[in-house]
């Protein structure tokens, strides 16, 4: 993050199974934690939703396809996706259409939990540095940061600036490169 130079900020790396958070100031981590909700958990929750609502058991790959095609954090999104699976009530294959609006509630609930963890992290920042973080942005990275609407959702919930680089899924690798 070029925007991060000599500033403070909260880094939220939404990986596949874990989200890592760090409050960083002047190249030092002053507080951090890991939260066991990542992109794969979002996908699993979509699969669970489809099973509960439609009685359709879909594979993780089908749920991931749905997440990538139409899921997002825009409540008025009118897109939709089609998934196929096993109807557990009929014992037969079936294909259904799921709207982005349906999935929004599932994703919003998970992202609200993530925002709560960021808020908790901000409360653990040492008092003498807390003012820096109130004026600093949240940096979202990792593959999960690419979820449609994630940046705006965080901005609306956290009332803080939010930055997501176009290559956010490579942020951890690029960061590791700097220390090697």
Language-model features: locations:
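Glycine-rich phosphate-binding loops at beta-strand->alpha-helix junctions
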Residues: 71, 75, 129-154
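Extended, folded domain segments that form the structural surfaces/walls around functional sites
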Residues: 1, 5, 13, 147-153, ...
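Conserved helix-loop functional segments at active or binding sites
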Residues: 120-128
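Conserved phosphate-binding/catalytic loops in two-lobed NTP-binding clefts
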Residues: 154-177
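Phosphate-binding glycine-rich/basic clefts of nucleotide- and phosphate-handling proteins
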Residues: 25-115, 123, 133
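Residue-level signature of catalytic and energy-coupling elements of molecular machines
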Residues: 13, 46, 83, 118, ...
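A short acidic Gly-Thr/Ser loop motif
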Residues: 4, 11-18, 24-28, 38-40, ...
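Conserved phosphate-binding catalytic cores of ATP/NTP-utilizing and phosphoryl-transfer enzymes
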Residues: 1-12, 174-180
